[in-house]
Amino acid sequence: SVGTLKLPDANNVFSKTTYDYEDCNKMLGREGLEKYTLNNISYNKNYRFAFIKVHIDNITEYKDTHGKKAYNTILDIIKETLLKVVEYRGVAGNPDNETEYVVIVKDLYNESELRAFIEYMRSRIIWECKAFDVSFMPLFSIGIGRYPDNGTDFKVITNKLIKATDIAISKGGNRYIIYKEDIHGEL
């Protein structure tokens, strides 16, 4: 969507799209992710967001076997790949620790689009990691919460996102869980 701004006492009018976010080309912290989401919702209450938490299941083992330098390179590859995958559709960040990431993507209107995006994201990360080190096959536990499907409060959706990720990890990892109240319960 586009908003038009006219400054008082000015002859100029300019438009700015809500897709344009000054920090979209870097990893954000918790505050940046929340600010991005709340700003976009204030522009358009009809936005649909997918909150995707990506936990790399086997990254610690990779660090133990390949060392800190290779581990840091893999983390950089994952960050760069997430930013490329998201592009103009949202933002990415790692608010909790260096091995878990949160991606917030707009305008995935149904579950098939969401699943396709997740598979695309996983494939790109695997491809880029294997280009660096063919021996590393990243495994993912992914939790997904959705706005407005899982609520309209940022903290509630974040808690559901965390619960979905915990469920994926507890089931043995290397899977994704889309949080659904009728299956996973209310928080």
Regions found by a protein language model. Give the residues of each.
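Conserved long alpha-helical elements within nucleotide-processing catalytic cores of c-di-GMP signaling
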Residues: 17-50, 57-83, 93-98, 102, ...
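Short catalytic/binding micro-motifs of nucleotide second-messenger systems
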Residues: 84-89, 122-135, 167
